[in-house]
Amino acid sequence: MNKNRKRYSLIFSIFIFFTAFFSHNINSEARTTNYGYITHPLLIYFFDVGQGDSMVMILPNGKTVLIDGGDVEHGGVVIKKLRRLHINAIDLLVSTHPDIDHIGGLLKVMNSVKITKILDSGKKYNSHSYYLYKKEAYQKSIPISIAKLDEKIMLDPNVDITVLNSGKKSYTNNNSSIVLKVKYADISILLTGDIERKAEQRLIKNENINAQVLKIPHHGSSTSTSEAFLFAVNPTVAILSYDKFNLFGHPHRSVMKRLNHLGIKQFTTDQFGDIELATNGHKLYIEKEEVLVDP
């Protein structure tokens, strides 16, 4: 009887080991299937959430960063997209600023996905969506820290993530947006929230914002993406997130004219839906297409 019990115990232990092993590999493979020729990739998925913003980064070591959650109606959409990527937990949630098209969907996300911690812009706002977002974080006991200028986000030793802009009392919601520069070896990506020209001018003056990939601020609004800002960033690629039938005229024709004049390649959620970016720190692929960039 004891021998049988030991045998069953051994078989069960082996079963658990291989189940965990293959489960891990299935998840890892599912995240990198389209870029199997890249080892240790940094992946960014810019989600199509209509007239809003949401994106997720999967760092080379497997850590995950969710930036914004779209509006209220798209919270469930973000959850489905995360699950398709086999993401059931988020190591860091970045709430760039308190506008509803960025934080509205976070209530559903926090209810469905385990969030380890939140990085917030520090900009307070008197709105129902902002109140519910803060209340849910409190009820879920999710720690919130306020982003500080030049703060380093330490999640993967091979990827530098730096805060270049965050909330100030004198700033509007948009100009309080958290701006992140993500650098993986030779490749840099600038993620800009909804900043407008005032914040752009401060970044030009005080920060190194040069990057091969630029997430265009404020959905391509005329209030952002000045010529001086584009010269300072000097991107090869621009990512734009907006709804085709939005009521704001995004992206503004003046912004698109500047991008075209400077020869900056554009990827839009209107055209592509979700946009996939993958890099090993040397080569850059967007929508499975290699994009030649200068290091």
Residue ranges and their predicted role:
Residues 2-295:
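Non-globular, low-confidence helical/coil segments that flank catalytic cores
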